[in-house]
Amino acid sequence: MIPSAITSPAPDRRALSDFRALAGRIDGNGPRYTSYPTADRFHNGPDLSLYHDALAACRADAPAPLSLYLHIPFCENICYYCGCNKIITRDHGRSARYVNYLGREMALVADRLGPRRQVLQSHWGGGTPTFLDPGEMRRVMALLHEHFELAAEGEHSIEIDPRRVDHARMALLAELGFNRVSLGVQDFDPEVQQAIHRIQPFEETRAVVDAARTLGFRSVSLDLIYGLPHQTAARFGRTIDQVLALRPDRLSVYSYAHLPHVFKPQRRIDENALPPAGEKLDILVSTIERLSAEGYVYIGMDHFALPDDDLAVAQREGRLQRNFQGYSTHAGYDQVGLGISAIGAIAGRYVQNARTLDEYYGALDHGRLPLARGVAMSADDHLRREIIGALMCNGVLDIPALEARHGIRFGTAFAPELADLAALGADGLVQCAPDRITVTPLGRLLVRRVAMVFDRYLREDAARPASTGAQAVAANDGAQPVRFVPRARYSRVV
């Protein structure tokens, strides 16, 4: 029987040693595959028929449960590293208007989906969702309950800025039905915090974590970033010491993507203070070693969880999936996106809302869904999304089962990809057999690179002349190397 999931808790010492040797040669820029096709492949333009068709198909699938993402874009202060869609303001009057328009959007969406569809997973992201005052948070939650049925047994999470909440606000979140919280930390080192314009003492974060534990939240997650200015392996190790003292249920340790040509706030970061590639690699490897030694399960890419956390259990049982929030246990449901720039994944279509308040408000003032762009998935997209998801989440692709579901001959349909995989196999990233493809412990550390092999859009890019100055990632097609040309928003694989 083909295994349904990865069973090893983390890459072993040999894999980490090989990773150090290989990373510099195989590194490059690539997608994170929170969707396929990736968001940069969406078609610009408000094709409302695409969204209407998606909602109609979702309505026909009732009473299947939904996932819901709600975007609150406001922040009081700018963090220089941030690449999120955000609005920096101290005018809390702006959020009151935004809440009213969220209600309008919910009404339009719910009217097409059918009344009070059940929501098993919801997530408030930003920006800073806790920018909203208590009254506004109650109002948004009341609107959600008016138009949807938020299942009490579901997973309902919110991103928190520990600098903006106290015990009373945490108690309010629990009262409103949130059972998971995600806290932005990035790094506890004072010099790093100064360089990224985010001063957040450890004691401030500990108070919020303690409140979450006291109030009975099901899960507490912390977000860290490595590759920030002034970081070293030793300094980041001290941050890990402090994080381990808090013992979060989940940890995300993201690689900082320095893209000042895309994200203007990053232009305030001193590039000379960024850790060199070798030091950044040391930070990552030492972090994986330390967290593994402390009992955390390496979920994949940048996610870690305690063994009894839902993510770790889902991985062991082969139920792990990915969506726009990363690894998830509920990614198989249609996801509705609400608020500016929010992305929905509904009935084989991706839809993204307008990115500015003016466009968002303007559409809703005319009684229209605030769609900005999207794409309808082809049969090939569905097939490749399943392959990429299996490799990134479970580490195993069951070829006979895939062939049966999609009516294909894998070896014929993916001959160029298999040739590329042979090259990655020679580097120890994958093991290929007639009935399966298995990602090795080393390959788990570079799983984005493995997934890129099956990205048809990257192959089409590679077939066109590379843009001037673009850095390409080589892959072997059995004859001449394929050059995967990175796009502007892609971050480094390592």
Swiss-Prot record:
The cofactor remark states: Binds 1 [4Fe-4S] cluster. The cluster is coordinated with 3 cysteines and an exchangeable S-adenosyl-L-methionine.
Q: Where do the annotations place S-adenosyl-L-methionine 1 binding? A: 69, 126, 159, 343
**Catalytically driven reaction(s):** coproporphyrinogen III + 2 S-adenosyl-L-methionine = protoporphyrinogen IX + 2 5'-deoxyadenosine + 2 L-methionine + 2 CO2
Instruction: Enumerate the cofactors the protein uses.
Output: [4Fe-4S] cluster
State the EC number(s). 1.3.98.3
Where in the cell? Cytoplasm
Q: Which SMART domains match?
A: Elp3
Q: Which residues take part in binding S-adenosyl-L-methionine 2?
A: 81, 127-128, 186, 198, 223, 257
Enzyme class, UniProt record, top EC level? oxidoreductase
List GO BP terms, alphabetically.
Answer: porphyrin-containing compound biosynthetic process; protoporphyrinogen IX biosynthetic process
Keyword annotations of the record: 4Fe-4S, Cytoplasm, Iron, Iron-sulfur, Metal-binding, Oxidoreductase, Porphyrin biosynthesis, S-adenosyl-L-methionine
Q: What does this protein do?
A: Involved in the heme biosynthesis. Catalyzes the anaerobic oxidative decarboxylation of propionate groups of rings A and B of coproporphyrinogen III to yield the vinyl groups in protoporphyrinogen IX.
Task: Name the PANTHER family on file.
Answer: COPROPORPHYRINIGEN III OXIDASE (PTHR13932), OXYGEN-INDEPENDENT COPROPORPHYRINOGEN III OXIDASE (PTHR13932:SF6)
Q: What else is known?
A: HemN is able to complement a S.typhimurium hemF hemN double mutant under aerobic and anaerobic conditions.
- What protein am I looking at? Oxygen-independent coproporphyrinogen III oxidase
Gene name per UniProt: hemN
